[in-house]
């Protein structure tokens, strides 16, 4: 009778590591992508794809510095065959991109997910895509139309990606597909529009307007992604912070000096500043300083078990 050898401690750890599921993360070298990879590598083998360098990644994260649309990237994905995929949509990529490139990258990824038989696809979209409006409902659910692209080409591109993934629900029912739409994400490591806006010492505002705002901490968003990766989760989910507050109160808590300006002055000033590359804020985004876009996060709480753990005060302190 052949004796069985009991695995040693290091061998058991090695076997457990080999058994870990592999997750592909796109736009992994963006500021939010870096935070996400540092969280996911504790539980998954992470394959990070981004054309930007990612030199400070965890040692066990595999990084391919290549465009996902290139054959080399597609060959790598087919070889590694990740069972889980996290796609940071254009709203979180932080690079200005042409609409064609944004849509082509997403279409390529969806094809790879289908070809490799990935079990799970999580796409990070944005609640901003609903669009601020003086006539919108107080708290929009996931069934509300995405109307934010009427004033901004960048938002329109992000909506196109969101809609493309929604159609994938029906095209590939074997893949558990999740779309997360977080409110404005802020954090100490982020270089997105909301975080940079809150870091200003002097903040321009629209005279006569004080919209309600919803913020969520970067770590809470990462928690939501981790929950969405669990088996059996699929659908569209708004991701919200613990509460909402007027813009004036948020800026006061940040000790920022507000500079109220009428719209006919602030709009042209932003156009000139953008032309001189002094800001990335587009005049079409002034609507966020005028009207509210509040969303309901009840579905994420009920179906994902998501609850934001960082208070609004902590979120503002951690904005950097």
Model-based region annotation:
Residues 2-13, 301-302, 310-320:
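Amphipathic terminal alpha-helices
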Residues 45-55:
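Conserved glycine-rich Rossmann-like NAD(P)H-binding loop of the short-chain dehydrogenase/reductase
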Residues 65-108, 112, 132:
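NAD(P)H-binding glycine-rich loop region in Rossmannoid oxidoreductase-like domains
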Residues 107-154:
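Conserved Rossmann-fold NAD(P)-dependent oxidoreductase catalytic core, especially the SDR/UDP-sugar
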Residues 150-178:
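Active-site Tyr-X1-5-Lys
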Residues 168-214, 218:
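NAD(P)-dependent short-chain dehydrogenase/reductase
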